[in-house]
Regions:
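Alpha/beta catalytic cores of nucleotide-metabolism and tRNA/nucleoside-modifying enzymes
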Residues: 2-11, 15-139
Length: 139
C-alpha cells in the first residue's frame, strides 16, 4: 500500500505492546502507528512506544500514575458527567496502578466506587499503603 500512494500511511489494529508497535512498523513500512484499544489496557503505551524509538526510558512514579488517573476521571466527568465517568473508571482506574505492590487489593474497591471523591480517597489510601503506612484497611 505504501508504495502505491503518495500520502502518509498510518498502521492500525491490534497494537497492545511495544513489540506490536514495532511489528506494525517493520512489517508494513507505515509512516506512523495509531494506538486505540491498546492504551485502554496500558495507558502508558504511547510513552513506551516513543521511548522505544528515542532510546529514553520514562518511568511513571506512583504519584504520576495517580495524578494521570485523576485527570482522566475528571476529564470524563467534565464531558460525560460524574455518574458516567465513575462507571467507566471502575474498569479503567486499576490499570493505572497495575504492577505496583498492593494494587490488587484496591481493584475491588475501585469496582465499587460511586463518586470522584471515592476515587480520590481510594487513591490516597493506596499511596499511604505504598509509602508504608499499613495501619488502615486492616493491614
Amino acid at each position: 500500500v505504501k508504495e502505491a500512494v503518495s500520502i502518509p500511511v498510518i498502521g492500525n489494529g491490534d497494537v497492545r505492546s511495544v513489540e506490536d508497535f514495532h511489528r506494525m512498523m517493520n512489517e508494513t513500512g507505515c509512516d506512523a502507528v495509531m494506538l486505540g484499544r491498546g492504551i485502554v489496557g496500558n495507558p502508558f503505551l504511547i510513552q513506551e512506544c516513543v521511548d522505544s524509538i528515542t532510546g529514553q526510558k520514562h518511568e511513571f512514579s506512583m504519584e504520576d500514575r495517580i495524578e494521570i488517573c485523576m485527570d482522566h476521571a475528571k476529564g470524563l466527568a467534565d464531558t460525560k458527567g460524574e455518574k458516567v465517568a465513575i462507571r467507566e473508571m471502575r474498569g479503567l482506574a486499576s490499570w493505572y496502578l497495575k504492577g505496583l505492590p498492593s494494587s490488587r487489593i484496591f481493584k475491588n474497591e475501585m469496582s465499587q466506587m460511586n463518586t470522584l471523591e471515592d476515587l480520590e480517597n481510594i487513591l490516597r489510601q493506596f499511596m499511604e499503603v505504598q509509602r508504608g503506612n499499613q495501619n488502615h484497611l486492616g493491614f
